[in-house]
Amino acid sequence: MLFRSTLADQLAEARLDEDVKAVVLRVNSPGGSALASEVIWREMELLRQQKPVIVSMGDYAASGGYYISAPADYIFADKLTLTGSIGVFGVMFNLEKTLKNKVGITFDSAATSPAAGGMNSLRPLTANERKSIERSIDRVYTTFTNHVAEGRNIPINEVLNIAEGRVWSGTEALECGLVDQIGGINEAIGKAIELADIKEQHALYEFTAPMTPFEEWIDSMGLLYTKSWGLDYNIYAEPIREILSNNPIIMNNNGVQALVPGNMKINL
């Protein structure tokens, strides 16, 4: 999951620290908020202008995870890394029938203009609201694909041919030009030392330590707060309930999202 307030701040800290000669970013994310992706992408761009930036992909570096990886000087991926998923979507739920049928609650409203009470989840979207959301999604998608084209030095037409949400393994991504080499974190560190031309003895500093169980619990409170207001998965129809239960990130992010579609498993 992508959180702009933490990762972006850490990238800025690394950029401003004169003792940091190169940065290796370990990406293991299926994506998240499109806004968070853009904020982190901007920090990656600023960082790359001052020192080498290497990305090491874990199990996932898809959609928003690839969005923030694109500006890197060099990208490593494992053979079975799931990456790509260059695409965005927007979610707007209509709870009108759900609340009426499940809880017995109905709503009436009075508006002074067609735009008043816009994007109300208690009624269907109007035609203008739907068009507005579609335009927003199109703008984010165009920005996303342009970032990939610029960061990877790939013609935009080629990017569009491998985009549209398609998911690639690390091996396939290498063939597509989305990554530079198959390798892990050690290879990424070696490449960072090479690009920074570090000759003397060096030390590795980890900006982000793994979360403790308590920190993970606190991190999950956003979802718990959502449930505390009664927006539990069980009030939705079965198809939507299945999607939400497997993708809690959707419930915790508003607006357009750059997120890998669904949960994927590879059976060897």
Where would I find each of the regions flagged by the language model?
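Short glycine/threonine-rich loop-to-helix capping motif typified by GTGT followed
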Residues: 34-39, 172-175, 217-221
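Intrinsically disordered, low-complexity segments enriched in small/flexible residues
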Residues: 1-12, 19, 26, 105, ...
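Cleft-lining beta-strand/loop regions that shape enzyme active-site pockets
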Residues: 1-98
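Charged, glycine-interspersed solvent-exposed loop segments at helix/strand-loop junctions
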Residues: 96-195, 199
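Short, solvent-exposed coil/turn elements at secondary-structure transition points
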Residues: 59, 81, 113, 165, ...
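A mature extracytoplasmic/lumenal domain signature
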Residues: 27-31, 59, 180, 185, ...
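Short flexible/disordered coil segments
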Residues: 39, 82-95, 116-125, 218-231
